[in-house]
Design a protein with these regions (language model features):
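Residue-level detector of Asp-centered blade-edge/turn motifs that repeat once per structural unit
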Residues: 13-14, 60-68, 114-115, 161-162, ...
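Beta-strand initiation motifs
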Residues: 36-44, 90-97, 137-145, 184-192, ...
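Conserved positions at the start
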Residues: 6, 53, 107, 154, ...
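Structural motif
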Residues: 26-31, 80-85, 127-132, 174-179, ...
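Short loop/turn segments immediately following the C-termini of beta-strands
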Residues: 23, 77, 124, 171, ...
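Blade-level signature of beta-propeller repeat domains, shared across WD40, Kelch, NHL, RCC1
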Residues: 365-368, 386-399
Length: 399
């Protein structure tokens, strides 16, 4: 207990701690806080206040967990084709209203812009990509379609880190289309890369510094990467010396840009390489315990300490420690598994949660995430997505 008469009290902005000022040394006492109440008291400050504490307050400055409002959005097979919810340490909030103009049909890919001022989806029918302003109030009025549309089903979508470009992976040649992006929406389509991917594009990602764009696709080499600049695509990087073993559906760069991972068909289902300014390095060793089957999505945690894979057979999602040496020993499966084929996976911006889009209701499943792996499953969102979720994305806006 505090050691004297309590004088003031305050919660941290993310609700994970509570502090009390009081008479008698140490004059301030703090505890973890959760839905179960008080946790074990934190150690006293090394330098104590000099006398009775009269007031206490938590600051947002420099704290990425408390300086943002967070959101989670899902691409889905059935109308309204995209849904979004507030996100917090408690899990899903009440669903935002649907956009006034819905995507045309099944959404396969979804992405917030880096500053979360926009939310974009890739979908099956024209215009094959739809984008909306995003704010704490939810969806804004849909941006005008790009003047030159992707030519067939949009499957993957990504914004460049500086939000100056948006790229769509799609199933018909040229297999990837990219556009300038601004607060006004889509600009004039960039020229196609001189050397195209070799088959239908399913996933796309930019490197963290925005200097590279990579596409996961059908057909060897299954992943194709290009330099990226304000002028668009550069000359294709050489293929990796050891390619993935089948058609690829997801691609992701590590947060430090030092690795690239590809998820797809055929064992080992996940393939990762060092990445540098010269392109692909020598393939990392496969994880000792492979994902159970064909992989559909891949994501690194924001701090780069973990990598997760969504796949087609139980446990539907597999996660591993990640380091400069590659894969670590697989984390234990979550105690409550997703209910069907894992299609997409993503970590929250602060790395405290992980969400999986999948077949079978509830269609999206989320867990706390820590250095120990999966925590106890969050309650399902209400209302649920009304059909399976091929992709999931988190966003956040500074308070």
């Amino acid at each position: 207990l505090p050691t004297g008469n309590g004088k003031s009290i305050d919660f941290s902005l993310d609700g994970s701690a509570i502090a009390v000022t009081h008479e008698n040394s140490p004059y301030v006492t703090a505890y973890p806080w959760s839905g179960s109440g008080f946790g074990t008291k934190y150690a006293d400050p090394v330098t104590l206040p000099a006398s009775i504490g009269r007031a206490t307050s938590f600051s947002t400055v420099g704290d990425p967990q408390t300086a943002y409002n967070e959101y989670v959005a899902v691409a889905q097979d059935g109308t309204p084709f995209v849904q979004a919810y507030p996100w917090s340490a408690s899990g899903f909030g009440s669903k935002f209203s649907n956009p006034a103009t819905l995507p045309a049909d099944t959404c396969w890919g979804i992405s917030f812009s880096s500053d979360s001022s926009a939310l974009a989806v890739a979908h099956g029918s024209a215009p094959r990509v739809s984008a909306y302003p995003w704010s704490g109030s939810g969806f804004g009025t849909k941006f005008a379609n790009p003047a030159t549309l992707p030519v067939t089903t949009g499957r993957g979508i990504a914004f460049s880190p500086d939000d100056s470009a948006i790229a769509v992976a799609h199933t018909g040649s040229p297999y990837v289309s990219a556009y300038p992006w601004s607060g006004s929406g889509f600009g004039t389509k960039f020229a196609n890369p001189a050397t195209l991917p070799t088959g239908p594009g399913y996933g796309v990602d930019f490197s963290p510094d925005g200097s590279v764009i990579a596409v996961a696709h059908d057909g060897t080499p299954y992943v194709t990467a290009y330099p990226w600049s304000g002028s668009g695509f550069g000359t294709k990087f050489s293929n990796p010396s050891t390619t993935h073993t089948g058609d690829s559906f997801g691609v992701a760069f590590s947060p430090d840009g030092a690795a690239i991972a590809v998820a797809g068909y055929n064992s080992p289902f996940i393939t990762a390489y060092p990445w540098s300014g010269s392109g692909f390095g020598t393939k990392f060793a496969n994880p000792a315990t492979l994902p159970a089957s064909d992989a559909n999505g891949v994501s690194f945690s924001p701090d780069g300490s973990a990598i997760a894979v969504a796949h087609a057979v139980s446990p539907w999602v597999s996660a591993y420690p990640w380091s400069g040496s590659g894969f670590g020993t697989k984390f234990a499966d979550p105690s409550t598994l997703p209910t069907g084929t894992g299609k997409g996976v993503n970590f929250s911006p602060d790395g405290s949660a992980i969400a999986v889009g999948h077949f079978t209701s509830p269609y999206v499943t989320a867990y706390p995430w820590s250095g120990s792996g999966f925590g106890t499953k969050y309650s399902n969102p209400s209302p649920l997505p009304n059909s399976y979720v091929p992709a999931v994305a988190f966003g956040r806006i500074a308070v």
